[in-house]
A protein has these predicted regions:
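Serine endopeptidase catalytic core focused on the charge-relay Asp
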Residues: 1-177
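Catalytic nucleophile loop of clan PA
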Residues: 178-189
Length: 189
């Protein structure tokens, strides 16, 4: 990356040059789907955006790694809460190749793909979606993925929006622990 910039004088008469650079992003998120045939996965269900500008962050390359949820900040009205955790920095579980409005996408390592192969579940096609009782799979403590009860209240038509449906958490254990869906759970299926 090459840039040209001209320094400016500050109040004391000294020339200064300011630069705002972001070279990485990190966070805990949820894998939404995995294709056992190709090893391709999608996660989050929404793009990763710059906290200051709200714009989608460009992604040249990246890695995913295992994470463990260490704490939950319970969500309340007007305060979304969050999952807090640690990354396993000793090995990559796969590579990232895209950050889009619909989520991040990548390919799992052969070792991690094999671990998930026996846990793969079929997903409903667009025509199979319906309102009513359902379950999401989420990890809100340690590395244990559990099923939680929800109610799908409304399905939105595909108007180009990344918003697909409105759900209501009905699972008492999840409500007690997190208060509902908190950031880092948005890719839960």
């Amino acid at each position: 990356l090459e840039l040209c910039a001209a320094p400016e004088k500050d109040e004391s008469g000294d020339y200064r040059l300011g630069a705002w650079v972001r070279d990485s992003m990190a966070g805990i998120g949820t894998m939404t789907f995995y294709d056992p045939e190709s090893g391709i996965f999608g996660a989050l269900g929404h793009g990763v955006t710059d906290a200051d500008t709200g714009k989608l962050l460009p992604l040249d390359h990246g890695s995913i790694m295992d994470a463990s949820v260490k704490a939950v900040k319970r969500g309340e009205r007007a305060a979304p809460g969050e999952l807090k955790g640690d990354f396993d920095l000793t090995r990559d579980s796969g590579t990232l190749f895209a950050n889009t409005e619909s989520g991040i996408f990548g390919k799992l390592s052969a070792e991690d793909a094999e671990k998930l192969r026996t846990q793969a579940l079929p997903i409903a096609g667009k025509s199979e979606r319906k309102t009513g009782k359902a379950q999401i799979l989420a990890t809100v403590e340690g590395k244990e993925t559990r099923a939680y009860d929800i109610e799908i209240e409304k399905i939105y038509s595909s108007s180009g929006s990344t918003r697909n449906f409105l759900l209501h958490v009905t699972d008492e254990a999840l409500l007690a622990q997190t208060g509902g869906i908190v950031p880092a759970m948005s890719g839960s299926v």
